[in-house]
Regions:
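Short, solvent-exposed alpha-helical surface patches in non-cytosolic proteins
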Residues: 155-214
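Catalytic cores of secreted/periplasmic lytic hydrolases that degrade extracellular macromolecules
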Residues: 1-155
Length: 214
């Protein structure tokens, strides 16, 4: 992995984790699509418009746009067309809009995918891209750069090992805050329900809550 590639993943990873907890898009898929669609953030669209995902502009969307040539695979051949693409104020705005796009009912199977391979296939099947090799290209990026490990991080934080030690009256609340990423278990996957919370830990919890609200 080059330094530029490492920096790009580090740039995308925090927001990718955040949108998983809020919108259920696997972080590996988010990062892999950003890599493919923006060529590691070096595409003209990424540089001029902060658009990492090749999301097109539509009338009434409330965004500015840039016009760029793009290739579409139609009737078994590649053709070049001029298209309008959304222009964002920041990279994070682009990531959030991508997550919102995947809330469309046609992407329901992407959000319910059990792993990155299924998610990669379903996002293509739902019409995100016309390239028939798109799923494999996503999977190759995820496996080459071990992006699935980020999925494992967020999923392990949800499956806490000592959930049976949580009082019945608190189980729903604990499940909700862990699922949303507001509170997580320790490195071994234990929630430690009876352990006291320090002021600095409380600050982290409140910060995560504020991020979800924002």
């Amino acid at each position: 992995m080059t330094q530029n590639q490492e920096d790009f993943i580090a740039l995308i990873k925090p927001e990718a984790i955040k949108i998983y907890h809020k919108y259920k898009v696997l972080p590996s898929l988010t990062i892999a699509q950003a890599i493919l669609e923006s060529d590691w953030g070096t595409s003209i669209l990424a540089i001029e418009a902060n658009n990492l995902f090749g999301i097109k502009w539509t009338d009434g969307c409330g965004c500015d746009y840039v016009v760029k040539q793009t290739k579409e695979y139609i009737s078994n051949q590649w053709i070049t067309i001029d298209a309008k693409f959304k222009k964002y104020n920041s990279v994070n705005d682009s990531i959030i809009d991508y997550a919102l796009l995947l809330q469309n009912p046609r992407y329901e199977k992407v959000l319910n995918a059990k792993d990155y391979k299924e998610a990669a296939f379903e996002v293509w099947q739902a019409g995100y891209a016309t390239d028939s090799n798109y799923p494999q290209k996503l999977i190759e990026q995820i496996e080459k750069f071990e992006l699935y490990k980020i999925d494992n991080e967020v999923l392990s934080s949800i499956n806490i090992k000592d959930f049976d030690q949580v009082a019945n009256w608190a189980k729903d609340a604990v499940k909700k805050v862990v699922d949303k990423g507001i509170m997580i278990g320790d490195d071994q996957g234990f929630f430690n329900p009876l352990q006291p919370c320090t002021r600095q830990e409380l600050a982290v919890i409140v910060s995560r809550l504020l991020e979800l609200i924002e």
